[in-house]
Each structure stands twice: as C-alpha cells, then as structure tokens.
C-alpha cells in the first residue's frame, strides 16, 4: 500500500463547485432527488465510480433512466449495502454446514421494512451463496403507513424469500 499518495476530497452542496474530472462520487441523499442529482453531477463532471444509497430511486422508470445515463457516461455504480463486508458474517458463514439449507428469520418492531429488509436479504444471499430468489408478500399488511420520514411510506407484516435451492428467509416486522 502506497502511503505517500495525496488525495483530495470535496464536500459540496452545489455541482458548480466540483472539479470537472474525479475518480469517485458518493451521493448520500434520500431516493426522491437522487436521479436529478446524478444527472446534474454527470452533466458537470466526468466520474469513474459512483456510490449510491439504497433504495436507489422511487420508480421503475427512474431505474431505467439511471441505467441508461450510467451506461452513456461509462460510470461504474455501487450500492452502499456494506453489511456483507462485516467480519462476523464471514465467521458465521464459516460455521454453517454447507450441506444443509439455511432457514434465516429476523423480527423487528416499528422499523423500516421498506428500506431495511434489503440488508438482511443481502446477508442471506451471501450466506446461502445463491444469486436469485422469489418473494412472497402475501402476509404483508395491505395498509400503507406514513414513514417516519415525510413523503415516504412503510409496510408491516411478513415477507418470505425463497431461493431456487430451498433456502428461506422470513422477515416479520410489526408496529
């Protein structure tokens, strides 16, 4: 590792204050303005790598638009979902019997099912080593509830994730 290398970090709230070329940008904001911010950023600067918060966008059309933009600009994009890199998950993975199916459950009260379930799904997929799953939302309450954050919504109930090999993740979130 080179220790005598100097790097510059810019923290800005206006794109015109950014340099025209740089290696990495981290866009840390809520999902509603994210696509507009990415558009402004990439219209102003040439960027190699982009890190975005989950959930990325608020509609499927925004995902399509962003995908096209990132491809046009040649930007590699990562989603900030870091739990799988926490060392203790590697230790848990080492303890698992690879010949047995994983049946993982997590329970919670009054916390964001919509924005937090992804962390557990990501860990589940890391531990079971599979790349796809089916989701059963039949036990999610049909009532839409206002989130703690204005303008966002939340759901409660049970989600079930099933992989092709039969591994299962059960998420139960209640009020």
Residue ranges of model-derived segments:
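Short loop/edge segments at beta-strand edges and connector loops
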Residues: 12-13, 52, 79-81, 137-139
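A contiguous active-site-proximal alpha/beta segment in oxidoreductase catalytic domains
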Residues: 16, 24-27, 56-121
């Amino acid at each position: 590792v080179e220790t005598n290398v100097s790097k510059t970090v810019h923290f800005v709230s206006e794109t015109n204050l950014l340099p025209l070329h740089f290696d990495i940008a981290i866009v840390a904001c809520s999902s509603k303005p994210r696509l507009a911010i990415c558009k402004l950023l990439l219209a102003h600067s040439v960027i190699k790598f982009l890190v975005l918060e989950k959930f990325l966008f608020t509609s499927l059309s925004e995902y399509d638009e962003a995908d096209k933009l990132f491809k046009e600009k040649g930007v590699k994009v990562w989603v900030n979902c870091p739990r799988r890199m926490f060392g203790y998950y590697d230790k848990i993975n080492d303890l698992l019997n690879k010949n047995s199916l994983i049946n993982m459950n997590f329970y919670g009260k009054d916390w964001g099912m919509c924005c937090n379930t992804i962390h557990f799904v990501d860990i589940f997929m890391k531990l079971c080593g599979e790349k796809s799953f089916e989701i059963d939302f039949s036990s999610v309450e049909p009532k839409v509830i206002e989130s703690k954050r204005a303008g966002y919504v939340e759901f409660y109930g049970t989600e079930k994730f099933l992989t092709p090999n039969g591994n299962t993740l059960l998420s139960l979130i209640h009020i």
